[in-house]
């Protein structure tokens, strides 16, 4: 019987919390807010895509019902929702080539899953070659000004190394144990690197999103390589410090991050519409933390997760197909 990997559940909880917190922090300003926001965006999505790769297995039904189906569904839902709350006439347009805001994650994951049969090798040298190739592609993609939000192609290349690394890490069956001195040195490096990210005028929010070319975001391949390296450094650090034991309440919520991720956007859009972050910076941050944790507790509970899975991941279609066969 497969043993539950609570370390990964705990890490997913932390990352989904940072996703929500980051989205709420976009809605207000402040020096600390700006600095913390940049630190979050330097690693939280690289780590999320690493975990996505870690748990990735190619199944046609999973691809269609677990990824393509919810992408189409929520692309429609969010377009209608935005049209209703932001357009006085209630009009909206629906198209699927350019994902709506947070749905870029689903679209690039669909593309990554399509690559899995090509990535499926147990040869260590081949794995290393593929990871290095993906890093080179991520660096070269920054020169192409045609890559952007359409098809999430810019992000596809930007986060590809993390997904592939996660996929191969799962196959290596590592225990994520590192010497204490190594983690100490890595922690110092992360502090220095984070200070550089905060103070560097070249590393803007656009750069951290992974959606813009070097020309459009005014940076270069050197900074891109630095950010890729930093993303991997954060992943190693987090895999060491996150507890491997079950943490009451948190571990369970970490198992149900898809529902939280896809549904929280509606709340964020309403928060922006009604400008609920209208206090001092410190009060806004506290409000954002409490709101993020409350949403995770609400949307990540087992009951919501069960019904979300039934309705929005195509499991009901799978159930009907099984009945007919």
Name each model-derived stretch.
Residues 1-325:
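Alpha-helical transmembrane segments and their immediate juxtamembrane cytosolic regions
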């Amino acid at each position: 019987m497969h043993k539950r990997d609570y370390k990964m559940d705990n890490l997913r909880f932390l990352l989904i919390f940072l996703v929500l917190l980051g989205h709420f922090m976009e809605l207000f300003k402040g020096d600390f807010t700006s600095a913390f926001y940049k630190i979050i965006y330097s690693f939280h999505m690289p780590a999320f895509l690493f975990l996505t790769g870690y748990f990735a297995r190619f199944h046609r039904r999973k691809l269609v019902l677990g990824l393509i189906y919810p992408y189409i569904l929520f692309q429609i839902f969010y377009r209608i929702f935005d049209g209703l709350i932001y357009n006085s006439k209630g009009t909206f347009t629906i198209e699927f080539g350019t994902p709506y805001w947070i749905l870029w994650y689903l679209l690039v994951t669909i593309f990554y899953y399509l690559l899995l049969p090509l990535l499926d090798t147990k040869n260590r040298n081949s794995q290393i070659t593929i990871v290095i190739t993906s890093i080179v592609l991520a660096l070269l993609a920054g020169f192409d000004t045609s890559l952007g939000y359409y098809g999430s192609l810019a992000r596809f290349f930007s986060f590809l190394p993390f997904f592939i690394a996660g996929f191969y890490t799962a196959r290596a069956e590592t225990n994520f144990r590192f010497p204490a001195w190594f983690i100490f040195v890595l922690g110092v490096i992360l502090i220095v690197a984070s200070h550089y990210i905060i103070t560097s005028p070249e590393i803007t929010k656009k750069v951290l999103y992974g959606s813009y070319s070097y020309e459009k975001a005014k940076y270069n391949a050197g900074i891109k390589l630095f950010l890729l390296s930093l993303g991997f450094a954060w992943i190693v650090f987090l895999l060491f410090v996150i507890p491997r034991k079950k943490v009451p309440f948190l571990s369970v919520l970490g198992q149900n991050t898809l529902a939280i991720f896809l549904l929280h956007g509606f709340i964020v859009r309403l928060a922006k519409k009604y400008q609920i972050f209208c206090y001092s910076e410190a009060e806004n941050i506290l409000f954002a933390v409490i709101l993020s944790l409350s949403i995770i507790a609400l949307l990540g509970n087992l009951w919501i997760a069960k019904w979300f899975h039934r309705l929005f991941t195509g499991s009901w279609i799978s159930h009907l197909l099984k009945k007919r066969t």
